[in-house]
Amino acid sequence: MSYQGSWDKRGEWLELIPGKSIAGQADREEAARQWLLETVGMPEKLYRKLRHERGIEWRGDRLRLILFPYREYGVEPVWHELEVLYEDDFCLVANKPAGINVHGDSTGGEELTLNHAVAAYYQASGLHTAVRPIHRLDKDTTGPVLYAKNEYAQLKLDEDMREKKIARIYAAIVQGQVQDGLTTIDLPIGKDRHHRSRRRVSLTGQQAVTHILSVERSRYASLLRLRLETGRTHQIRVHMSHMGHPLIGDSLYGGNARPFGRQALHGERLIFAHPLTGEQIEVLAPWPEDMLQLKEDSLFLS
């Protein structure tokens, strides 16, 4: 379900044109309700909220929805250079560098996060909305992170994540030569009771599925493209280590840290459906310099 017509953002309001078959109904309110829920795909939770807050109104043949209200960022804006890979009124995709988390931990520390940088970007753009990351990346993993810029987008994208409709393609450089027969790793992942930060393959863990899309081999290492079907903490790192091919630089899971200093893992592509229009959006994130150098280094890939 999606909206295929024209739309305009006017301040806090989104204006849609449902068409004469809806606008001309004797009971326009009920016709609009059915159209929003059954054709556009608006989550019923949000529809009820907008109705309660008088956030739905007709203006001529246009149906207006308050989808862009003023909201606190939810995190302090802290300026940090931010590479924006994609942006419209509903979504933002930021390219996360290595060395920062997407969001803070429960201790509420002062460490800079990607959320802080996104809040500062919103502030500089004159946008007042909550910072809403749809997924996360490990601190030292690079690549695209998807943000919803309003509650409607958040509800739709969260649903798509749960239903595994958002594709995340990663590039990883691992130790050893991965053989062609290894195409899917379906092994549950749980916490390692002996190490606070580690995860491990565990029969009592949560289902975790990683698909290997392609393999390029050198004498010492392999370059993999992988797609996550699930999104468990450290999933690619745990799965590849368990298969005997830890990521280069990933000392937490048995990788040799000396030539790189972090796990050689980069989110290369993010593919999702636009929350309003349903248009398929594919975002490519350029490789960081350290990954490019590692790829070109003849010690690993030639």
Regions found by a protein language model. Give the residues of each.
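Pseudouridine synthases involved in rRNA/tRNA modification
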Residues: 1-53, 80, 229, 237-302
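RNA pseudouridine synthases
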Residues: 1-184, 292
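Homeobox/homeodomain signature
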Residues: 4-6, 32, 46, 74, ...
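Short Pro/Gly-enriched beta-strand edge/turn motifs at strand-loop
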Residues: 65-67, 193-196, 207, 250-256
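Conserved hydrophobic positions within beta-strands
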Residues: 84, 174, 211-214, 247
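Glycine-centered flexibility sites
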Residues: 99, 143, 164, 176, ...
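The conserved catalytic core of RNA pseudouridine synthases
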Residues: 127, 133-158, 187-243, 267-302
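Short edge beta-strand segments in beta-sheet-rich domains
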Residues: 165-169, 184, 207, 260, ...
